Amino acid sequence: MTPTEQLKAILTEKYTSEDGDEYQVELKPGLTDQQIDDLEKGFPTGQIPNEIRELLKFTSGFEFYGLEEVNFVGVGQFGFEEFFPTSVQLAGDGFGNFWVLDINKNGQWGNVFYVCHDPAVIVKHSDNLAEFIKHVDEFGKKGKESNLDVIHEVTVMDIWTINNGFMDKSTALASTDEKLKLFASSLPDNFVISDLRDKPIKSGFAWGKFGPNIDKAKRHDSELLWGVEKVEKKGLLSRLFGK
C-alpha cells in the first residue's frame, strides 16, 4: 500500500483511550500544489516522490491519541543532522522523544526511526511511512503489545543495556563488505560503527553511550551506516595531570 492507501484504510477504525473514551483518526487539511512546491525546495533533489505528493494533497497529517500529532510536513524541524542530514519529524511523545523519517541524498523517503534521549538510543521503527501508519493503527488497537509501545518501553532499554549496536573499526575493516570497509577507513581509530542496512525493525544503536557530544558523529552519504566517537574515560591520575 502507498501511505495514502494505508491511511485511508484506518479512517473508519475506532479506538479506545486509556480513559475509556472512543476516538478516531482526525485528518488535518491537505496542502495546495503551491504549498507542496514550496515544501519540496527543502529536499536534497528539490523534488517530492509522487506518492508523497499524493499524500500531502490528501492531508498534511492527523491527530491520534497518545501522540502529540502525526505530521507529514515537519521537514528540517528535528535537527540532529549528524545522524539524519535530511528528515521529517513525524511525531513526538511529549517527553522529548521523536519518530523521524530518514530521507537520503536522492530524495527517497526511507525508514522511520524512533529517537530516544533517555536512554540515548536510535531504533529502526518502521521500514517506510506506510508501515509507520500501520504501526500507529496497531498502537491504537493493541497498546502495550504494539510495535510502537514495545520499542518505546522495552527495546530502547535492551539496546542501551545489552547490545549497544556498535562494532569496532577493526571489525569493520576486516569485513568482506566493501561499503562498510570504505566507510570505516574514513573514520578515526577511536570511532565505533553502527550498521543498520538490511537490519529488521527494532534494531538500533545507543547513540549517547559514549557521551552526549555528537559533533564528530558521521553518517554515510547514502547508507544506514554511522560512525560515533568512542571517548575513553580518563582515570583519576590522567585527570589530575592532564594526560
Please provide the spans of the model-predicted regions.
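Compact, glycine/acidic-enriched structural inserts
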Residues: 110-147
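A surface-exposed partner-binding patch
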Residues: 1-108, 148, 160-243
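Short aromatic loop motif centered on NTY/YTY
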Residues: 152-155
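Alpha-helix N-cap recognition
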Residues: 125-131, 158-165
